[in-house]
A protein has these predicted regions:
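Short glycine-enriched nucleophile-adjacent loop
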Residues: 1-7, 12
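The feature captures the conserved acid-bearing segment of alpha/beta-hydrolase catalytic domains
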Residues: 23-120
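Alpha/beta-hydrolase-fold serine-hydrolase catalytic core, especially in secreted/extracellular enzymes
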Residues: 82-218
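Sec/Tat-exported extracytoplasmic proteins
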Residues: 5, 16, 119-123
Length: 218
């Protein structure tokens, strides 16, 4: 959920987590050119870790877990490290899938104090203007910050939206996006007066901005 909906989470904190059905359940993904893969692509978690670039991640795992192998945690950590600088990783020696100690009032594996301290300390900007958003499709995850993708050019590829801000100008570039809307509330929250989308400039006013075909596929 954190990789697909980064606009909803300031912190992602998996405890004894597994990566995907393909890595944990033993059912490999079809070829990426297959429509069956396109339908399952949203569960291919490593494809979307770039969405966590400006988020905190706290991974917890017992090194004797006989349910979800700790290799799942180490592998996911490897995927995350190129993008996430706010990364913490706790391995509990000798612990299985469910474990407890004396650090938390509840079970330590789910009430780990350092994880909750991290959650208390981090804040989410709902209208962030500096981001990369990658989604398997608009029918899975269409919105991040002020951008909502209405339709993709093809279901065979992820859609990608990159945003940056310089002064009162926000610049957005897209890939595999057929049409989208930009929230006036979100743009104004960033005090933007101009937004540039794929090289075209649009003035920021009080109305949402629709870009791309208004008819056809959805």
């Amino acid at each position: 959920l954190g990789t697909l909906f980064p606009g909803l989470f300031a912190v992602v904190g998996p405890s004894a987590g597994w990566i995907s059905f393909a890595t944990y359940g033993g059912n490999p993904f079809p070829a990426e050119t297959s429509p069956f893969y396109w339908a399952r692509r949203s569960s291919d978690t490593p494809r979307y870790v770039e969405n966590l670039t400006h988020r905190a991640v706290y991974i917890i795992h017992g090194d004797a877990d006989d349910n979800v192998p700790i290799s799942q945690a180490y592998t996911m950590k490897g995927y995350i490290e190129p993008y996430v600088t706010d990364l913490q990783f706790h391995v509990e020696p000798g612990a299985g899938h469910w474990w407890d100690g004396d650090k938390a009032g509840g079970a330590d594996c789910v009430d780990w104090p350092e994880l909750f301290a991290t959650m208390d300390d981090r804040r989410l900007d709902p209208w962030e203007s500096e981001f990369v958003f990658v989604s398997p499709s608009p029918w899975v995850s269409p919105t991040h910050s002020f951008v909502t993708v209405q339709s993709a050019a093809t279901p065979a590829a992820d859609l990608r939206v990159t945003s940056s801000q310089d002064g009162d100008t926000i610049t957005v570039t897209t890939d595999n996006v057929r049409n989208l809307t930009l929230s006036a509330e979100g743009l104004n929250a960033n005090e933007a007066t101009v937004v540039i989308v794929d090289g075209e400039s649009y003035p920021v006013g009080e109305e949402d901005i629709w870009i791309g075909p208004a008819e056809g596929k959805t």
